[in-house]
């Protein structure tokens, strides 16, 4: 029953689908195992949060700041991360199937072992990212890992 706030503990919470959390500040929140499928979390501050093993199917993170957030093994199938700051996010082992990262900042993101089948990275900054196969993307990588 905790309201959205910085450092809130929503570990393993199961929210109603299509929840509107646009513009919230959840910096440092504990959300491991949370279910926010189909939620609208656009234009939000979710930096330094723990969202590992969470369910974010079709969740909208458009224009959000997720700097240094842990999304290890999260299910982000068809999620929208367009124009978001994802620098230093840990997507290790995450399901990013058909997710969109158009114009997103993925500087030094960790995608080791992630499923990126069908994901869209148009105009995304991939400089310094650790790619799904463990190689490091060159500085200046945009849209593809060079």
What function would you assign to each model-found segment?
Residues 1-146:
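Tandem repeat scaffolds
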């Amino acid at each position: 029953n905790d309201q959205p706030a910085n450092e809130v503990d929503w570990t393993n919470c199961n929210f109603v689908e299509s929840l509107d959390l646009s513009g919230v500040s959840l910096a440092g929140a504990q959300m491991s195992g949370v279910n926010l499928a189909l939620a609208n979390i656009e234009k939000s501050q979710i930096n330094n949060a723990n969202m590992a093993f969470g369910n974010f199917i079709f969740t909208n993170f458009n224009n959000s700041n997720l700097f240094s957030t842990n999304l290890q093994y999260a299910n982000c199938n068809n999620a929208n991360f367009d124009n978001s700051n994802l620098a230093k996010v840990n997507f290790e082992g995450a399901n990013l199937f058909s997710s969109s990262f158009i114009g997103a900042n993925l500087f030094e993101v960790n995608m080791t072992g992630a499923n990126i089948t069908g994901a869209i990275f148009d105009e995304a900054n991939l400089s310094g990212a650790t790619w799904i196969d463990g190689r490091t993307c060159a500085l200046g990588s945009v849209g593809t890992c060079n």
